[in-house]
Amino acid sequence: MSEIVQALVIDIGSGVVKSGFAGDDAPRAVFPSIVGFPKHKGVMVGMGQKDAYVGDEAQTKRGILHIKYPIEHGIVNNWDDMEKIWHHTFYNELRVAPEEHPVLLTEAPLNPKANREKITQIMFETFNVPSFYISIQAVLSLYASGRTTGIVFDSGDGVSHVVPIYEGYSLPYAINRIDLAGRDLTDYLQLILTESGNSFTTTAEREIVRDIKEKLCYVSLNYEEDMRNTEHLASITKTYEMPDGQVISIGNERFRAPELLFQPKLRGLELKGIHQNIYDSIMKCDVDIRKELYGNIVLSGGTTMYPGLAERILNEIKALAPPVIKIGVVAPPERKYSVWIGGSILASLSTFQQMWVSKAEYQEHGPSIVHRKCF
């Protein structure tokens, strides 16, 4: 493989696709992982109506489209739509010919074996890639933080995972998947804003709620006290200007929405909070590596971007862990894209070049080769 050909790194999440070139320090293209189909054929006569729209274009036209999310909770559920997203990524966003570049894809922890094989098959047979690799998202985030051992809390739009990793290998028996992530926090914020007299019902308004969440929400270090403390309310209240110029004020909703991560019961969800999930995952690991995991709790993904989250996790884990244990929570500033960045680092290492699954290996062994080479 000549040095000049850059590998492509594609991290497709339940909410957002991050894609670009290995060796770059940030993804080149970031767009929503959605596919939209026109509700009525021929509504846009003379506009060159397409059969399907992907990403930002689907987002802007969503009023006249049926929107589909091909990835739910981190796992592909519709292969035809998924193929459209890959096609769009290669040809429209990155503007590359996939048959000319090695491709590194990411996958959710505990991704079913059949899914890995299907992805491998599509890459080699539909897109004709010369070589391919698939890597677990949380492991890439850990690499991006400069570690090979630690426990990653990775939370995106559709799913969260707690993944303990020892010397570069994830420990599947101790992974916790939590079906609570960014989309649920947006829903919850929409609910509590509606309770305080604002109306957000359309999909466009839902995007506004997501924007409010990303710009104004934070994690409280003492939720019960902050809920009781009415004097403190004036100091935390912020205003938000809607697209139509109307200004709304947001008070304790700012910290009530992300609190769901620690207290899913606030929405009647029978799930454990993220701190409990991190602790449980560490306790499933061998006693000899726990100390190292406690000291290297690494945050990753867009839903870990709230101010106060790292400190709150630290406090909650301190309360659960043995008192002598030193706890470290690492929140890299670029963690929104750390899975992609880890992939970019990995795919450009000279030592990694022998790891790729080549087209010849695929032709000889079929899709199951992926389990032998990517783990």
Swiss-Prot record:
<comment type="similarity">
    <text>Belongs to the actin family.</text>
</comment>
<dbReference type="GO" id="GO:0005524">
    <property type="term" value="F:ATP binding"/>
</dbReference>
<keyword id="KW-0067">ATP-binding</keyword>
<dbReference type="Pfam" id="PF00022">
    <property type="entry name" value="Actin"/>
</dbReference>
<comment type="function">
    <text>Actins are highly conserved proteins that are involved in various types of cell motility and are ubiquitously expressed in all eukaryotic cells.</text>
</comment>
<dbReference type="GO" id="GO:0005737">
    <property type="term" value="C:cytoplasm"/>
</dbReference>
<keyword id="KW-0547">Nucleotide-binding</keyword>
<dbReference type="InterPro" id="IPR004001">
    <property type="entry name" value="Actin_CS"/>
</dbReference>
<dbReference type="GO" id="GO:0005856">
    <property type="term" value="C:cytoskeleton"/>
</dbReference>
<keyword id="KW-0206">Cytoskeleton</keyword>
<dbReference type="InterPro" id="IPR004000">
    <property type="entry name" value="Actin"/>
</dbReference>
<keyword id="KW-0378">Hydrolase</keyword>
<protein>
    <recommendedName>
        <fullName>Actin</fullName>
        <ecNumber>3.6.4.-</ecNumber>
    </recommendedName>
</protein>
<keyword id="KW-0963">Cytoplasm</keyword>
<dbReference type="InterPro" id="IPR043129">
    <property type="entry name" value="ATPase_NBD"/>
</dbReference>
<dbReference type="InterPro" id="IPR020902">
    <property type="entry name" value="Actin/actin-like_CS"/>
</dbReference>
<dbReference type="GO" id="GO:0016787">
    <property type="term" value="F:hydrolase activity"/>
</dbReference>
